[in-house]
Structure formats: C-alpha cells, structure tokens
C-alpha cells in the first residue's frame, strides 16, 4: 500500500507538473515576444528622437538663415549712405533677394520636411499606439495565460492541500501509532516491571518456600525421627506388652488350665460328692474331710483369684496407660500428619501458585513475544509511514518549490510588468515633458532671437539716425553756405528716414510674422499638451485597468481562498474516493507506462523505418537526379534533332518549291505524299531515338 501511495503521489505530482511546464513554456514564449516588441518599440523611440533632433537642427538652421537675412538687411539699410555704395547695395539687395527667395524656398522645403517629419512622427505615434494596443492585447493574453497558470496553481494548491491532508492523516495515524507504541511500551514496561516484581516475589516466595521446605524437611526429619523413635519405643513397648501379654496369656492359660483342672476336679469332686452324698452315711466323715479340703482348696482358689484379679486390674491399668500413651502418640501423629498435610497443602498451594506464576510468566512471555512482534510490526509500519511521509514531504517540497518558483516568477513578471508600465509612463512623461520643454525652449529662443533682432535693428537704426543727425548738425554749424548741399543731405536723410521707416515697417511685419509663428507654436504647444493629456489619460486608463486587474486578481485570490476552504471541506469527504481514484490512476499509469513502452518501441520501429525511408529517399533522389540528367540530355538531343528536322523540312520545302516550279501537277500530288511519308518516318525515328 505504501508503494502504491508513493506511486500515486508521484503520478499526481507528474500529472500536475505538465500544465505548469506548458504554462512556463508559454510564458517564456511570451517573454520572448515582449522582448522583441520592446526592441521594436525602442527602435521606434530612437527614430522619433532622431527625427526630433533633425527638426531641432532644421529650426536652428532656419533661425540662422533668418539671422543672416536680418544681417543682410541691416547691411543693406546701412549701405545706402553713398551713391557708390547704393549700386553695390542694389546688387547686394538683388543677391539678398535671390538668397531670400532661396531661403524661402529652403523654408518651404524645411516646412515640407517638417510636415513630412510631423507626418512620420504622427505615424510613429500611431505605430506606438498600435504597439500599445498590441501590448495591451499581449497583456490580456498574458493575463489569460496567467489565469491559466493561476488555475494550474490552484489545482496544484488543491493537490498540495490534498497531499497535506493526507500528510495530516498520515501524521495523525503516525501519532496514534506512536501513542499506541508508547502505550504498548508503557504496557511492556509495566509488564516488565510486573515480571520483575513477580520474579522478585517468586524469588522471595521460592526463598521462603525453600526455607519453609527446609524447615518442614528438617521438622519432617525431626518428626520422622521422633515417629521412628516413638515407633521403635512403641515397638519395644509393644514387644514388652506382647511379652507381658504373652506372659499374662500364659498365666491366664495356666490359670484357665488350672481352673479347668479345678473345675474338672470340682466336677470330679461334685461327682464324688454326688457319690458321697449317695454314700451319706457312710462317708460323712470322709465328706467333711473332703469339705474341709475343698474349702481349703476354695480359699486357696479365692486367694489365687484375688491375686489374678489384682494382676488383671494392674494389667488393665497398664493397658489403659498404654492405651492413653497410644492415644497420645496417635494424637501427636495425627497432629504431625495434620501439620504434614498443612505443609503439603501449603506446598501444593505454593506449587499451584508457583505453577500459576509460571503460567502467568509463560503467558506474559507469550504476550511479550506478541507485543514484541506487534512492536516490530508497528516499527516496520512506522518506518514505512516515515518513508511515505518522507516521500510525501519530498513531493510536497518539490511542489512547494515549483509553486514558490512559479509564484516568484509570476511576482517577478508582475513586478517587471509594473516596472515596465511605470517606466513606460515615466518615459512617456519624460519624452513629452522633454518635447514640451524643448518646444518651449525653442519657441522662447526663436522669440528672443526675433526680439533681439528687432531691438538690434531698432538700435542700429537709431544709432545711424543719431549719427546722421549729428553729422547734419555739424555740417549745418560748419557750413552755412552749403545750404543746398545740406538740403540735399536733408533730403537724403529724409529718404534714409523713409528707408528706416520702411525697415521699421518691415521689422514690424517680421514681428507680426514672429508673433503669428509664436501663436502657431502656442497652438502646436496646446495641441501637444492635448496629445500629452490624451496620452496621460490613456496611460491613466491603462493604470486604472491595471488597478482593476489587480483588484480582480485580489478578488480572485479571495474567491480562491474561499474555494480552497470549501475544497478543504470537500476533501475530507473525497478521501475514500481519492484512494480508489489513486488505485485506478496507478492502474492507468501502469497501462500508460506500458503504452509508453509500446509507443517507444513503435517509435523506435518508426525511427528505423524513417531511417530506411530516408536512405531510400536519398537513393531515390540520386536516381531522380540521374533521370533528370538523362531527361535533360534527351531533351537536348530532341531539341537538336528537331532543329535538324526543321532544317531538313525547310530544305525539303525549298526543294518542293523548286520541283513545283519545274514539274507538273500530277507529280506535285504524289510528292506531298512522299514528303508526308518522309515526315512520318522522321517523326517515328525521333520517337525511336527518344
């Protein structure tokens, strides 16, 4: 089961890694596309910068030309002092007019260039906007890919949570097993302690039992010795008693014999008495004598009887004393037997307890063996679970590393995108700010230059007018006689004043033109500001879209967390199904592996077949090349033969014409047939040659 579980974990991890790898490949491709588009965008930016530089250079060139025109006009206005110089000034004026026309043409050309550059700039702006739209589309695609990757990450998170729940289950099982192992270890320790206590109790009981047995054995030996002594004494006493009894029996027998003899004598005497009574008279004396003798004998018998009765009483007392001693001995023996029975009962009880303790020890040993086997099995299961846990932890670590790497990559990509967007925003702001600043600076420079030119022209005119007035005053003070000359000079001065006025009017017209150009520049500046505002609004919209996307991502993450919690709840229900599915997946994986092996074999076969086909193709190509060469040779031969045949046909036609000119109609009818036959023969020869 552990191997199956590890296989399922690795299979699930391998199945989960496929969409992650696809997402990573797609992200890498998109990164490459973004890098290429960034390069193109940078090239466009460089082109725009170059165009702006050219525009600035053109403006500076136009300002320089205007300065040169102003200087030329100043020279022309200052060159009208003398008549000799007037011709030169006229020539210079013509040249300057020509140059002015050329400058106007150059201005028009520059305006055309400016218009073309502005069109190019607008086209570049449109291209930039198109690229921005493309970038937005790419961003949307990246967002969709990110969503797919997020979905894959969610799946990975779900599988991680499943693996974590399985790890928690394994850990709970391991904890329960550890608790059981600890409890069993505690029970083992208790059993060992009980065994030690029982062994100590057994040792103490065995010692007590051995000491009691020794005491009993010593007591038994003493009692046996006492009993043996008592038996020996009893035997001795019994022998003595038997001897005495035999003596008494012999005496009793003797007395019985004597009594029988006496009874026989008494009977004889009674018979004699009967005989004597029969002989009463005759024998009273003898009877009396015999009565006296009988009385003496009876008295003697009475004495003997008394003696016998005394001896019998004495013997009865001895017997009673012996009986009492025997009873005492029997009581002692019974007491000893009871003590022996008690000792034997104690020994039997102790032996039964010892046997019970031995059985308990055996049972405890069997339980210990069973517990050891269970502990060994539990240790093996614990090792297997540890290995499974390590495998699961490894897979979890791999998945976590993959997730962390993917999350880091996504964060890095997100940061890069944000940094790129910020950089784009900053670059756009900087570009347009630089453009605005450059335009402001250029317009201010142009306005300042025009104002400086006008002021310089006015100051130069004023200085010239003051110098002329001073010269006129000096001349008026010096020569009153040359009043006509002075009048002429005054007329000249008036004419110079008219020229100055015309120059002033020209300057005012130039100032109006400059003001109009300033107004146009202001309008262009306003348009540029509007474009900048539109771009800023566009970028603000992009930023708002990014913020909306961020909020949507955060909401999705929130919903994802809620779904993860729901999935955690559902995961507890689907664990049994997961086990079944893992078994089915293992079977499918095995089938897939077998199919992969078969596919690899087929792929190898196809590779070999492809190699054979490539070799055949190479050989076929060589044969085709040879055939093409032969076809080319045959075509060349056919072309040559056709050319020869055409030449022959031309010759035949010429010959036919000659024959027509020389021969009649009938022969003409036959000759075309011959010519057709010759042509058919020539064609068949061509076919045979081909």
Swiss-Prot record:
One of its GO terms (biological process) is macroautophagy. Its main location: cytoplasm. Changing residue 684 to F: Abolishes the interaction with lgg-2, but not with lgg-1. Changing residue 685 to K: Abolishes the interaction with lgg-1. A motif (LIR 2) lies at residues 684-687. It is found in: Cytoplasm. Residues 671-684 have a biased composition (Basic and acidic residues). Keywords: Autophagy, Coiled coil, Cytoplasm. Changing residue 684 to A: Abolishes the interaction with lgg-1. The keyword ATP-binding does not apply. A motif (LIR 1) lies at residues 61-64. Disruption phenotype: No colocalization of P-granule components with lgg-1. Furthermore, there is an accumulation of pgl-3 positive P-granules in somatic cells of embryos. RNAi-mediated knockdown results in increased lgg-2-positive autophagosomes following fertilization and at later embryonic stages. Residues 666-690 are annotated as: Disordered. Residues 381-385 are annotated as: Required for interaction with lgg-1. Interacts with sepa-1. Interacts (via the LIR motifs) with lgg-1 and lgg-2. Shows strong interaction with lgg-1 and weak interaction with lgg-2. The LIR motifs (LC3-interacting region) are required for its interaction with lgg-1 and lgg-2. Involved in autophagy. Thought to act as an adapter protein that brings PGL granules to autophagic structures containing lgg-1. Association with other adapters such as sepa-1 is required for the accumulation and degradation of germ cell specific P-granules by autophagy in somatic cells. This ensures exclusive localization of the P-granules in germ cells. May also play a role in the removal of sepa-1 from somatic cells. This is Ectopic P granules protein 2. The gene is epg-2.
């Amino acid at each position: 089961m552990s191997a199956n579980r590890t296989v399922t974990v690795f299979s699930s991890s391998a199945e989960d890694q496929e969409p992650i790898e696809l997402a990573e490949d797609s992200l890498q491709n998109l990164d490459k596309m973004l890098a290429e588009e960034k390069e193109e965008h940078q090239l466009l930016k460089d082109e725009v910068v170059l165009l702006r530089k050219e525009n600035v250079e053109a403006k500076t060139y136009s300002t320089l030309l205007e300065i040169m025109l102003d200087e030329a006009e100043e020279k022309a206005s200052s060159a009208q002092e003398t008549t000799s110089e007037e011709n030169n000034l006229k020539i210079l004026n013509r040249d300057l007019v020509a140059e002015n026309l050329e400058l106007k043409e150059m201005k028009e050309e520059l305006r055309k260039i400016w218009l073309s550059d502005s069109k190019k700039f607008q086209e570049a702006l449109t291209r930039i906007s198109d690229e921005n739209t493309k970038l937005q589309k790419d961003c949307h695609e990246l967002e969709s890919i990110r969503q797919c990757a997020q979905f894959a990450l969610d799946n990975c998170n779900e599988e991680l949570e499943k693996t974590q729940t399985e790890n928690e289950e394994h850990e709970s099982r391991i904890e329960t097993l550890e608790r059981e192992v600890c409890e069993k270890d505690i029970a083992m320790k208790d059993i060992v302690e009980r065994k030690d206590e029982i062994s100590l109790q057994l040792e103490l009981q065995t010692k007590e039992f051995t000491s009691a047995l020794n005491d009993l054995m010593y007591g038994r030996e003493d009692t046996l010795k006492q009993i043996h002594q008592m038996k020996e004494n009893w035997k001795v006493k019994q022998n003595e008693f038997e001897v005495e009894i035999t003596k008494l029996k012999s005496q009793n027998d003797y007395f019985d014999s004597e009594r029988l003899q006496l009874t026989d004598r008494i009977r004889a005497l009674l018979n004699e008495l009967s005989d004597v009574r029969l002989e009463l008279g005759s024998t009273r004396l003898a009877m009396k004598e015999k009565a006296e003798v009988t009385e003496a004998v009876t008295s003697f018998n009475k004495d003997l009887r008394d003696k016998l009765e005394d001896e019998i009483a004495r013997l009865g007392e001895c017997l009673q004393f012996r009986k009492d001693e025997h009873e005492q001995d029997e009581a002692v023996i019974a007491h000893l037997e009871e003590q022996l029975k008690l000792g034997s009962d104690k020994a039997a009880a102790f032996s039964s307890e010892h046997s019970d303790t031995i059985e308990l020890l055996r049972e405890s040993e069997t339980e210990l063996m069973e517990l050891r086997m269970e502990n060994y099995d539990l240790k093996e299961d614990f090792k297997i679970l540890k290995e499974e846990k390590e495998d699961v932890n490894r897979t979890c670590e791999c998945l976590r590393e993959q997730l962390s790497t993917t999350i880091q990559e996504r964060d890095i990509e997100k940061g890069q995108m944000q940094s790129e967007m910020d950089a784009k925003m900053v670059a756009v702001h900087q570009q347009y700010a630089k453009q605005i600043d450059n335009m402001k600076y250029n317009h201010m420079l142009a306005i300042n230059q025009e104002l400086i030119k006008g002021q310089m022209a006015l100051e130069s005119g004023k200085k010239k007018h003051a110098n002329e007035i001073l010269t006129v005053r000096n001349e008026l003070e010096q020569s009153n006689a040359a009043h006509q000359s002075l009048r002429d000079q005054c007329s000249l001065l008036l004419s110079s004043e008219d020229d100055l006025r015309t120059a002033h009017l020209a300057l005012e017209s130039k100032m109006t033109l400059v003001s109009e150009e300033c107004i146009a520049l202001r309008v262009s500046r306003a348009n540029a500001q509007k474009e900048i505002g539109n771009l800023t609004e566009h970028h603000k919209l992009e930023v708002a879209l990014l913020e909306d996307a961020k909020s949507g991502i955060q909401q999705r993450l929130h919903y994802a967390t809620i779904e993860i919690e729901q999935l955690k709840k559902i995961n507890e229900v689907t664990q049994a199904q997961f086990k079944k599915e893992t078994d089915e997946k293992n079977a499918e994986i095995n089938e897939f592996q077998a199919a992969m092996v078969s596919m690899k074999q087929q792929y190898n076969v196809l590779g070999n077949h492809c190699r054979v086909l490539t070799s055949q193709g190479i050989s076929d190509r060589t044969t085709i090349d040879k055939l093409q060469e032969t076809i080319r040779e045959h075509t060349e031969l056919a072309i040559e033969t056709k050319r020869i045949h055409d030449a022959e046909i031309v010759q035949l036609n010429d010959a036919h014409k000659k024959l027509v000119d020389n021969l009649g109609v009938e022969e003409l009818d036959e000759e075309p047939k011959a010519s057709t036959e010759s042509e058919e023969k020539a064609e068949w020869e061509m076919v045979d040659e081909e």
